[in-house]
């Protein structure tokens, strides 16, 4: 189980995360949702150690990740897959080279073993025929799928996704959401996604946490959202639905 206890984080004197305590569901698709600027991205990056909390703790099972040194954290990070917003692919590397990078950096596997794993992951995201392409030759949805393949190439226990469907059209967003959720279920991964997209919540969210102004305002299942007695959350749901409708009309 991944959990946070009383996480506080400030930037330039402004408190971005304020006393955040959450228990994420093991082997499930967990979503951190909220308006832009609510602290969702900062929380996600704090969970993986890209930001250090001013106070509070992040736990992986019975291990206090926050209190670990660099070497000890490195061992846990081997179990973490990360999908960065925009994909964060290396422009000068092919698709298969991008996916293989974690294996090159963190394992002593033979080249044959690495390529077997790379090919398996590319097949899983349905990009086996794009292995020799470069990022500039890919669509937005293909870039996201390469990022997913790279994130799972080390067979992680935990998968963190920073707005994985940002910049995508509604149909492609659904494809990416479903792919991440399928992988979560198939391999029993604990997945945590930061998103502003209510469609993601209603389609794949097994547990969702709503942040507002850096505080946890609500948590529950997608079924609970429909009956939530929380005006701020209800306003967010309505605004998200209207924004989605406007985008579809514009397209």
Placement of each model-derived feature along the sequence:
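Helix-to-loop junction immediately C-terminal to a conserved catalytic motif
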Residues: 48
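Conserved ABC transporter NBD signature motif
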Residues: 56-64
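Conserved ABC ATPase "signature" region
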Residues: 64, 111-129
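Conserved ABC ATPase signature
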Residues: 134-138, 142
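A short, proline-enriched helix->beta-strand linker immediately N-terminal to the Walker B motif
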Residues: 153-157
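Catalytic Walker B motif of ABC-type/P-loop ATPase nucleotide-binding domains
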Residues: 159-162
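Helix N-cap at the start of a conserved alpha-helix in ABC-type nucleotide-binding domains
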Residues: 170-172
């Amino acid at each position: 189980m991944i959990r946070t206890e009383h996480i506080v984080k400030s930037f330039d004197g402004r408190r971005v995360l304020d006393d955040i305590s959450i228990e994420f569901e093991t082997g499930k698709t967990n979503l951190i949702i909220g308006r832009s600027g609510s602290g969702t991205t900062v929380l996600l990056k704090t969970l993986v150690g890209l930001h250090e909390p001013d106070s509070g703790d992040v736990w992986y099972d019975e291990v206090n990740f926050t209190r670990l040194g660099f070497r000890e954290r490195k061992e846990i990070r081997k179990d973490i897959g990360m999908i960065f917003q925009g994909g964060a692919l290396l422009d000068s590397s092919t698709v298969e080279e991008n996916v293989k990078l974690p294996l090159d950096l963190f394992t002593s596997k033979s080249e044959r073993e690495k390529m077997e794993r790379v090919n398996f992951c590319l097949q899983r995201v349905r990009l086996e025929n794009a292995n020799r392409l470069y990022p500039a030759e890919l669509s937005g949805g293909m870039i996201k799928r390469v990022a997913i393949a790279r994130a799972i190439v080390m067979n992680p226990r935990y998968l963190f996704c920073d707005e994985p469907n940002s910049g995508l059209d509604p149909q492609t967003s659904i494809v990416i959401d479903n792919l991440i959720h399928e992988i979560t279920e198939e391999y029993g991964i604990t997945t945590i996604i930061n998103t502003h997209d209510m469609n993601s919540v209603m389609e794949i969210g097994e547990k969702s946490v709503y942040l507002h102004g850096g505080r946890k305002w609500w948590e529950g299942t997608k079924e609970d959202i429909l009956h939530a007695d929380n005006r701020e959350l209800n306003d967010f749901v309505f605004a998200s639905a209207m924004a989605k409708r406007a985008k579809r009309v514009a397209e």
